[in-house]
Amino acid sequence: MEFELEFTPDAWVHLQEFSARDRGLILDAINTQLRYEPDVETRNRKPMKDNLLATWELRVGKFRVFYDIDNDTVKIVYILAIGYKDHNQLFIGGKRFEL
């Protein structure tokens, strides 16, 4: 069954911080990786442990997409945040997070 994708306002702001090329890569990955079986762990998708931001992470090269899933009555993937990783640091919305 196909999942609906829903971006939070913050996620849209995060996405706009990237170049048009990078936005295209990220959006293509979201559409191909999260429309079907977004809750199946793969090489690029994994459940997050002890993370307050989201329950799942999608890796797109250096970019990270953090999302939650509603599997109950309606199938929705909520895109919560989008950032990029540089070595052991994660940047989301211009803020740095240590990993």
Model-derived regions, located:
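Active-site micro-motifs of SAM-dependent methyltransferase domains
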Residues: 13, 32, 36, 84-87
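Residue-level detector of conserved, well-ordered beta-strand and adjacent loop positions
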Residues: 8, 49, 80-83
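Enriched for short, Lys/Arg-rich terminal
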Residues: 2, 60-63, 68-99
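A broad, low-specificity signal marking well-ordered, structured residues that form hydrophobic/aromatic
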Residues: 5, 46, 77
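Arg/Lys-rich, positively charged N-terminal/basic patches that mediate binding to nucleic acids
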Residues: 1-30
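A short, surface-exposed loop/turn module that caps and links secondary-structure elements
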Residues: 32-57
